Amino acid sequence: MDKKKYIRNFSIVAHIDHGKSTLADRLLEKTGTLTQREMEQQVLDTMELEKERGITIKSQAARLIYKRENGEEYILNLIDTPGHVDFTYEVSRSLAACEGAILVVDATQGIQAQTLANCYLALDNDLEIVPVINKVDLASARPDEIKQEIEDVIGIEAEDAPLVSAKTGLNIEDVLEEIVEKIPAPEGDENAPLKALIFDSYYDSYKGVVCHIRVKDGKVKPGTKIKLMSTDKVYEVVETGVFTPALMPLKEGLSAGEVGYITASIKNVRDARVGDTVTEAARPTEEALPGYKPAIPMVYSGIYPVDGAKYEELKEALEKLQINDAALSFEPETSVALGFGFRCGFLGLLHMEIIQERVEREFNLDIITTAPSVIYKVTKTNGESFDLTNPTNLPPMTEIAYMEEPVVKASIITPTDYTGAVMELCQDRRGKFIDMQYLEETRVVIHYEIPLNEIVYDFFDTLKSKTRGYASLDYELKGYEQSKLVKLDILLNGDNVDALSMIVPEVKAYQRGRAIAEKLKEIIPRHMFEVPIQAAVGSKIIARETVKAMRKDVLAKCYGGDISRKKKLLEKQKEGKKRMRQLGTVEVPQEAFMSVLKVD
């Protein structure tokens, strides 16, 4: 009997907060995978940060055993995916490991930007999509309208979509039936050479790297010699098994169509990249599975220890996080203002925040982070070109022929009342309007091309505040475009503070420089001498503010008396302040580095 017939591999895709992880909990509970005692909320979100923010960061998997009423037993492999735009590549690999996807839509909110983005990813991977409408127990639920919307916008049949409530457990049985009925069984040949997709990997201090795999062809068991196709490295499999969400070893191994894990004493996650193909060393498959891309950082930021002596500890912390996160890259750098630290590359803003939070939390380090910047392509007048990740490394303007910046294609879904505000925001951020489609009378999708550097700072927050939190955003990198950019330097007391330098579009340099100078004036404490704050482009000062000096009243002891006596004392004080200003250093508080981002 072909056991593949009784396997279903599926994942759950949804917009943030539409109840994806809660639905996963209910499915685990319904199939008896976990007992009531082990049940806690969001079982598959294992990281403390994931639970706290209520988001899924790493993909997880679980094997459910579902008994139908006719006695047939099915193995359902649930692959949980992150829903955030930073982790799109991980989602696409998780989806490539499945044959079907459950599309969860919130009955009160309808389709959102991420729902569409992840749904299109699923369609790109030729998955069977099963719509499920969640949160029908709420008073404001509109299941019939939402069904219509799914049919109109995505074009998939939603007439008999199960109406469930993941919170109360209503109609969860229907979802399991739909999975078995609608999602096709996996294909694949057990006797062909081994071909398996790594859809996630993490580091375990006892087992080395644990690779989550979906076997497409062939089989793998302990003792098999395997080869990873992107690096051509060979390892011997130590253990194979399945997820119940905890790891459960299986001696007989995994065969075509199954989802499970392998360990092979791999030391670093970078050697077992997500999206790579595993094959047998002795009998390799002809071609790797399509779609592998090395993780490319999109956003760079400097991370420095508050206490310079903790530099080594910070390095260790980043190395440990990197073992588990192949997308994180870092290299040492020094800054005149902040001392020794690292320039780190991240997938996006959420990824950056998470790493910073984990460094502070898991390793108890106080860190200062500099403004995030994107990667610019710089072409010099002598024809050389290079990638610029740190604004301080920009050569003088006279040596630069032109610069290019990354541009993203953004889709924003918003209620029609806020269309004007959203378009105004996009225009203000140098966006190019592409098109606009109405989803229903009250909601619209707007497509814009926007430079990534405009999104990196606070685009998302501003978008939320302009639409009272109703708009949702999704974006993908489109490519690089030539643009007029300049480097904005900030000088304090005549000294350039390298950590505050940034690259800005020429047209916005004055406005941005003025705003930063005003902001710093509020933050920098008063010193015994006056501190000029200047914003400069090249050698030209474009804005200036002054933090006034604190002074002692030297005339307090003179009662009446001659004016020349007072003049002498004031002159003496002036001389002293002048000398102080030449020798004095300006203290820059930590908030100054972050406040630069919040300037609007």
Swiss-Prot record:
Residue ranges annotated for the tr-type G domain, each copy included: 5-187
Catalytic activities: GTP + H2O = GDP + phosphate + H(+)
Protein species of origin: Clostridium perfringens (strain 13 / Type A)
Enzyme class: hydrolase
Job description of the protein: Required for accurate and efficient protein synthesis under certain stress conditions. May act as a fidelity factor of the translation reaction, by catalyzing a one-codon backward translocation of tRNAs on improperly translocated ribosomes. Back-translocation proceeds from a post-translocation (POST) complex to a pre-translocation (PRE) complex, thus giving elongation factor G a second chance to translocate the tRNAs correctly. Binds to ribosomes in a GTP-dependent manner.
GO cellular component: plasma membrane
Keyword flag Plastid: no
Protein keywords: Cell membrane, GTP-binding, Hydrolase, Membrane, Nucleotide-binding, Protein biosynthesis
Coiled-coil zones: none
Binding site for GTP: D17, H18, G19, K20, S21, T22, N134, K135, V136, D137
Protein name stated in the entry: Elongation factor 4
Subcellular location(s) per record: Cell membrane
GO biological process: positive regulation of translation
Entry's EC annotation: 3.6.5.n1
Membrane topology: Peripheral membrane protein
Highest taxon of the lineage: Bacteria
CDD domains from the UniProt entry: EF4_II, EF4_III, LepA, lepA_C
